[in-house]
Amino acid sequence: MKEQPILGYDWEMGHEEIKLEIGTYYTGKGLYIGMLAKEDGVWESFSDLTVNLPFERSDVHEAFIQDFGSKEKLKFIQKHKLGKILPERGHSGFCTYAKVAFDLKRLEELDPEGMKRFYKDHPELEEQSQV
């Protein structure tokens, strides 16, 4: 099994080396993308790239971006060609969330095992899967 690619992430506190962790939210079966950073030699949760808004309308490859550090996260998505930022927004409470149409093939390159699990939760995508 080959090593997962590492992506650079720049934010207000500096630069981080990030791996992505792909999954599915339990409620609503939406696309989950977590960000892992190495701490003391161990890859652990750094932040969530996405947020679960199960009552907002979205396609299976779309997700809403967590509001904390969203400007930096949107730049990260663009820099690493993870997907396309959409004009629609999601809402929950007083927060507004950017919506992104993620490139599932690109996500397969970054976390093949996570995408296998994601495709198991979405059998309608199985013929598109290359992992």
Put a short name on every predicted segment.
Residues 115-131:
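Short, cationic low-complexity segments
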Residues 34-82:
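Acidic, aromatic-enriched beta-alpha/helix-loop junctions
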Residues 67-120:
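Short, compact, well-ordered microdomains
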Residues 1-39:
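OB-fold ssDNA-binding interfaces and closely related basic DNA-contact patches used
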